[in-house]
Amino acid sequence: IIWLMVLVMLGTLAQKDMGLFAAQNKYFSSWIIWFYFLPMPGGRLTLIIISINLCFFFFNKNIWKIKKLGIIILHFGGVLLLFGGGLTSMFSSEGNMVIEEGAQSNHVEDYHLMELAVINTSAAGFDEFTIFDQPLLKRNQLLRHANLNFEIEILNYLENCEPARRTSPAGIQYKGMLKNFMLNELIPEKEDNWNRPGLIYQINNTGTRADGMYGIFLGQSVSQTVSINDKDFTIILRRKRTYLPFSIELLDFKKILHPGTDIPKSFSSEINLIENGAVRKVLIQMNEPLRHKGYTFFQSSFIEGPNSETTVLAVVKNYGRLFPYISSIIMCIGLLFHLSQKLPDLFRKSKEKIAV
């Protein structure tokens, strides 16, 4: 418990210098923390040790008595709380959904993770997507797939970058955007989602003029396209997408301003929840989220455009969402039960003292 308090203090102080996401990964989501050359247990390992310690409590023969039932219930609630926290830490995900008025969306974009999408746009009726997740986007990694008749070699992954126009002609090996621009690496921002990642890669073994070195970055206004053996491909670096079994259509976005200011007081999104052909109208407001199929949609922010407004919904999937509520109720029951067993003895001792 004392070491957990130290971790909370260190992680809280570190947020000022390294940002929330990096501090969380270093102190709370890690198994081991290195203090210079000394390894120490991280947040996950510490909580596992505490959980094991709590579980061993139930193997004590002396506790299985009626008069200690409240303590047993209390410890069971604590184990349940830690189990729910483990589920949240290991399997929960969060991102956002950006929808313009009148448009629909069926995917969530991750705040931190990226993916490389290679889209075959040759067919008239559909596009074929081949996705490579961020763990594969590292230096000297060779990307192959049965859907692709070429190879992509990752030359460099830039955590944060900006494009800059070339001051001298590029060599013949540079293709696409890199013929006119370079990607300059920048110092990463404290907050991870403020970064603009970039990728420098090489296309190999096409047997065509498409072989060469390319560059792309997050939010690139003109997508990188390439034609290889009569097939057209679009290559995009984007935030990792999670596709949902339903769609959300934004009907109307409303915001209320503080009187006499341009500062929003509250805002809401009137949406259609579309699933298997069925349409249900829902209003998402601040502090009144939509919960559906394990996902929770919060009204996060908005984007004002010249002709329409765009809503930004924060989306969370938390498998351990109910555990804090359930475990808190169980622990309260355990405490009340324990107090109800102890109060008669306390009253009796008080009466004996008064009598004396």
Annotate each PLM feature:
Residues 1-63:
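Membrane-embedded alpha-helical segments of integral membrane proteins
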Residues 2, 48, 69-72, 76, ...:
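Active-site-proximal structural scaffolding
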Residues 3-11, 50-57, 61, 67, ...:
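A broadly tuned "polar low-complexity/structure-edge" signature
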Residues 3-4, 24-28, 44, 87, ...:
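Long, intrinsically disordered, low-complexity accessory segments associated with secretion
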Residues 4-5, 84, 299-302, 334:
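Short hydrophobic alpha-helical segments that form membrane-spanning helices or hydrophobic packing faces
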Residues 40-124, 312, 316-349:
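Internal alpha-helical transmembrane segments
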Residues 91, 95-318:
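Soluble non-transmembrane domains of integral membrane proteins
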Residues 348-356:
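Cytoplasmic C-terminal tails of single-pass
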